[in-house]
């Protein structure tokens, strides 16, 4: 554009044509030049517009160029805004697609998980986002849908199981971070800092030759694991610290892959649910307390008092004829009073009438037999011998009856 302080319509038209031509070429290096030319033209035009000749044809051409420039600028601005919007949509859609692929398609190092487990997709997502296992709302909805679809394909074992909901999945991730030991590692080896935990997990995966989770943001490569651990602990790393971290890491990975309850299968849950009694309507729900959880102490049953009733027993006192076989002796409780002191005289009197009984009506045969027939056809044991061996003349003189009666009435 001319530097002449006087501005004519022809020069003004020439300047606009030049600007239009360069603007439509749309070269990046020409943009500052176009801005400078437009600024100069804007400054000169108000000063000379009153002195310009009235040429309708030139003025019409100037209006046409200005209109074309305005339309071109609006189109370029619309294209630029549309490009920015489309780029943002493409990035967002690509991110969602990658997340769904990462959730649905297991990685190579994690394919030892069983797809029959109810929490398969949740565990898979936990392993894939081990550096930050905090799923977004969209990821939660995707995991709920995938879990319910996979559970519905299992069959009869999930007939009575309600579908998974988003709040249940949120609670599962909270419990998983705590029970697996992820929160413990975060507290002990990362100072409860998620950024340090992310750096630590990536360093551990890199040292184990495992693929690190993808990140949309550009981050510097992970440092050595020992360096990261030492920095997080704030002191030199010891062998005990390294071993403790390795043990906690192995325990965490084992829990995430297999868990504790899901190692045995769903049939255990079905069996436990079937064994529970259905509570009656209106009955309060039993609450397990500490006293109920502890098994009752087994106490020794109280010993029964021994009976004081004397058992009938045979007398150990030798009989009159000790040379005879003692196996033929019979013990009767009625007439054992001669050798047992706890049999009352009334019992003896009720069962045997002494007034009608003569023990020596058979002569000396009574002394040769261990038993004799009493009234009522009862066999009665012979009276025990308490004195020395009796002489035949003493038996003939009748001393034995008084001796037996004296013992009977004692």
Swiss-Prot record:
Gene3D superfamilies assigned: Homeodomain-like
Function: The B locus has at least 25 alleles, and any combination of two different B alleles yields a multimeric regulatory protein, that activates genes responsible for the pathogenicity and for the sexual development of the fungus within the corn plant.
Protein name, as recorded: Mating-type locus allele B6 protein
Cross-referenced SUPFAM superfamilies: Homeodomain-like
InterPro entries listed in its UniProt record: HD, Homeodomain-like_sf, KN_HD, Ustilago_mating
Region of interest (Highly conserved between B alleles), ranges: 111-410
Keyword terms: DNA-binding, Homeobox, Nucleus
Residues spanned by motif Nuclear localization signal: 276-308
Main location: nucleus
Record feature DNA-binding region, as residue ranges: 107-184
Subcellular compartments: Nucleus
Feature: compositional bias, Basic residues: 294-307, 375-388
A GO-annotated cellular component: nucleus
Segments for region (Disordered): 202-224, 278-335, 373-393
Protein's UniProt keywords contain DNA-binding: yes
Variable domain between B alleles, as annotated region: 1-110
CDD domains registered for this protein in UniProt: homeodomain (cd00086)
Family assignment from sequence similarity: Belongs to the TALE/M-ATYP homeobox family.
Region (Not essential for B6 function): 333-410
